[in-house]
Regions:
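Surface-exposed amphipathic alpha-helices with a cationic face
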Residues: 1-2, 33, 58-72, 157-171, ...
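Glycine-rich, proline-tolerant flexible connector loops at the mouths of alpha/beta enzymes
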Residues: 44-57, 214
Length: 570
């Protein structure tokens, strides 16, 4: 049953291990082994008020190693001192990194763990939001983000890496990052520096319930964030980590996290956590899913989506690429500007002070740019006026009526969405910039997708709804036109509504996944009529459903929370 294309690990928290009996572990492990091929366990030495005694940990370590399961250490950087009275609040009891007592405790925990394990992962609580008097004094005139980025870089080096290596020079230290990339800089997570300090990184791919939980993450984030970390230092991100929290409403949502983690080419998957998954309904379903995903990995190579430029320490339009990723546009999130045929820039990208020069050179080379209204707004008054006559105003429009493409003066198609959408009003100079899609309200219309030329290149401006999830409420015809712009240089695009995602790979293979709760049909348009559409899992060619003047069209049926692997061949 061993997986050929990824490894599987389970994380075991300190509070559980501290009280675990070997007989109980034996029984629980038998349940897991019925369904999963576990190659590693992360054994946590410390979390909060719990630290596993050395002798107890050695016995647990020996237990798993006798089962041919590799053991690595884990640390959660939260702490509770029994006699400590604080007059300030620390979220999740994270350490105060200007408090010397806390720093010495962290050093002690790290050295204890390094004496036991050659590999250690830090769970994603290695951050600070502390605003105690000591931190306020240390911050001085710096912003909180600048202060915390500097602080956690120093703590990483001086209180994690150096102490660990002093005890065990062979120890490899992994930092696991949470799924809230937009907030890293505000809490001291600094991948730009920490990727050089730590031996490896690890990605949190938990998305759970996007609407009813604290983090409200689009499910596509399970894919995009892992790709961003892979693009920091290719090969240095060890894997993706997800859990079953808030997933009981829909087992499919749990399995989607597994799908996207594997689609993003994770080398290892970590399940959180042993005590929560033992005897869980999630485990048998996941076991079957991982076997199927392992087979899929034989047919996909490297991800090849449209680059989305998300610089280090940036925010602006949080997860906008994930919302759009849920509408059938394949993305590749990266901290580095890419000179590909098309690049997507958002308000996040505006944090690069040289972004305008990069865009101009990109366009002069005959390539395309798609920018959001948020990026346009952030760059107004900073030179973006050289590229377009479109401007963001402070006015809004509420409508569900849209028009597509211009024929002479009127539009070629008029369509209604499912509900009214609130959008910022953009203005432009007629015939200086061109309308591709507009929103109509009363006797007026407003840009949704605009087109400009600069040198040999083309720049598109996409209006972003005030509520990003309202992209899901745009008419299917509007979403299809937006896809066609993004996928101008691809051999295919889909005609469909919302909550359909596409993942593209370098070997002409792609995956279409449905996030809908009901069965749906997608029309897949192949631009090159000489190409055949293959199902590599079944080793068969699909039949053409419809033929247009320039395209072959295939009807692809998708069940809820399902996907299809397809390949184009000559």
């Amino acid at each position: 049953m061993a997986y050929q294309n990824f490894k599987l690990a389970i994380y075991c928290p300190a509070g559980f291990l501290k009280n675990a009996e070997l007989a109980m572990l034996e029984k629980d492990l038998e349940f897991f082994k019925k369904h999963l091929d576990i190659s590693k366990v992360y054994l946590e030495t410390h979390r909060g008020a719990d630290t596993v005694p050395r002798e107890k940990m050695l016995k647990i370590k020996e237990f798993f190693e006798e089962k041919n399961i590799k053991t690595s250490g884990g640390i959660t950087a939260t702490v509770v001192f029994g006699n400590e009275e604080l007059d300030y609040y620390r979220i999740f009891n994270t350490f105060c990194y200007t408090n010397q007592k806390h720093l010495e405790k962290l050093k002690e925990i790290v050295q204890h763990t390094a004496s036991l394990f050659d590999e250690i992962i830090l769970d994603d609580f290695f951050f600070t939001a502390c605003t105690c008097p000591s931190c306020i004094r240390a911050k001085g005139n710096l912003s909180w983000s600048k202060f915390r980025l500097n602080l956690m870089t120093e703590v990483s080096r001086e209180y994690v890496i150096k102490p660990a290596k002093s005890v065990n020079p062979d120890a490899k230290i992994i930092i696991k990052y949470p799924n809230w990339i937009e907030s890293y800089q505000e809490t001291g997570y600094n991948p730009q520096t920490q990727a050089e300090i730590f031996d490896y990184t690890y990605t949190g791919t938990e998305t759970r319930d996007p609407a009813h939980t604290q983090q409200h993450l689009p499910r596509y984030a399970s894919y995009s964030l892992l790709r961003w970390f892979e693009n920091i230092k290719p090969g240095k991100n060890l894997g993706g980590w997800f859990d079953a929290l808030d997933c009981i409403y829909n087992i499919g949502s749990y399995l989607e996290q597994a799908n996207l983690t594997v689609f993003a080419k994770a080398k290892e998957i970590t399940l959180f956590a042993f005590p929560y998954l033992r005897n869980s309904v999630f485990v048998p379903a996941l076991g079957l899913q991982l076997q199927q995903l392992d087979e899929i990995c034989k047919h996909i190579e490297n991800p090849a989506g449209i680059p989305v430029y998300h610089p280090f320490n940036s925010h602006g339009e949080d997860h906008i690429y994930d919302y759009l990723g849920m509408t059938g546009i394949p993305f590749e999130l990266t901290p580095h500007f890419q000179n590909s045929s098309t690049v997507f820039v958002t308000a996040d990208s505006a944090h690069d002070t040289d972004i305008l020069n990069k865009l101009k050179n990109h366009l002069l080379a005959g390539k395309d740019v798609v920018m959001t209204s948020g990026f346009l707004k952030a760059m107004q008054g900073k030179g973006i006026e050289d590229l377009t006559s479109v401007r963001v105003t402070d006015k809004k429009v509420l409508t569900n009526f849209f028009a597509i493409k211009t024929e002479v003066c009127s539009f070629s198609k008029y369509v209604y969405g499912k509900k009214e959408v609130l959008m910022p009003i953009l203005e432009h100079r007629t015939n200086a910039s061109w309308q591709e899609i507009v929103a109509i309200s009363g006797e007026n219309n407003f840009p949704v997708l605009m087109k400009d030329s600069f040198g040999k290149g083309t720049i598109y401006t996409l209006t972003v709804p005030e509520n990003y999830s309202d992209f899901y409420n745009l008419p299917a015809e509007v979403l299809t036109e937006i896809r066609k712009v993004f996928m101008k240089n691809f051999d295919f695009y889909i005609e469909a509504g919302e909550k359909i995602a596409i993942f593209v790979y370098t070997n002409n293979t792609f995956i279409i996944e449905s996030f809908l709760p009901y069965r749906t049909r997608v029309n897949l348009h192949i631009k090159d009529k000489n190409k055949k559409l293959i199902d590599p899992l079944k080793a068969c060619e699909l039949k053409i459903s419809m033929i247009s003047e320039t395209e072959n069209i295939y009807e692809i049926n998708l069940e809820p929370a399902s996907y299809r692997v397809l390949k184009l061949e000559n």
